[in-house]
Curated annotation (Swiss-Prot):
Pfam families: Fe_bilin_red (PF05996). It comes from Synechococcus sp. (strain WH8020). Belongs to the HY2 family. It catalyses: 15,16-dihydrobiliverdin + oxidized 2[4Fe-4S]-[ferredoxin] = biliverdin IXalpha + reduced 2[4Fe-4S]-[ferredoxin] + 2 H(+). It is an enzyme of class 1 (oxidoreductase). Keywords: Oxidoreductase. GO terms for biological process: phytochromobilin biosynthetic process. Its EC number is 1.3.7.2. Catalyzes the two-electron reduction of biliverdin IX-alpha at the C15 methine bridge. This is 15,16-dihydrobiliverdin:ferredoxin oxidoreductase.
Amino acid sequence: MFDSFLNELHSDITKRGGSPLPLPEGLEECRSSKSSSVIQSWLWDVPGFRRWRVTRLDAGDSLQVFNSVAYPDYNYDHPLMGVDLLWFGARQKLVAVLDFQPLVQDKDYLDRYFSGLKELNQRFPDLNGEETMRSFDPNQYFSSWLLFCRGGAEQADLSLPKAFSAFLKAYWDLHDNAKSIPSTIPPEEVKNLQDKYDIYSAERDPAHGLFTSHFGKDWSNRFLHEFLFPASSSHK
């Protein structure tokens, strides 16, 4: 279901001068020993970003997952870009989270970087649900204007493709425009905050249970700490 999203993101990254990087051995792809499920991941070197990861899980009609996180260079205090899309085919259920993930919740910081996401939040009302995500504190590393939906086929087929394209454009625009604005957070603190994001997320990642059920505990633990959130590896 999410191949078009994957292709669009990879096309954008390539046009921006991105080049693929090697993943830790054995983590670029895994096939389930119990089913036809397969998970593939990519790591990109993109100008202006220190790390951009992408993951696609195909478990047929039962589950489809698309996930990506972009980490700006430490010289930029820009928000991270986070995408989580899950489709449960048997239940015809969509869970979608698209966010510019703030390093801090300071008003000046939010005013500086979130006008584009605020506009999208208004433009796509069926993706600005008020329901709080259950696994995370919305006041940490999430914005008040994230596009969030627990919906069905209508949102998956109609709203989400348009919202995803607009979301990517808004994030690229944020990055391009903000490069000319001096960061207010020094690089060493940006690194510290990005590391804390990894640690925080690894402790709460709801997808870890899904990966474990499909690909086993050992592989999924490596995937969590070595690829998804590598700064968490020293805090296991």
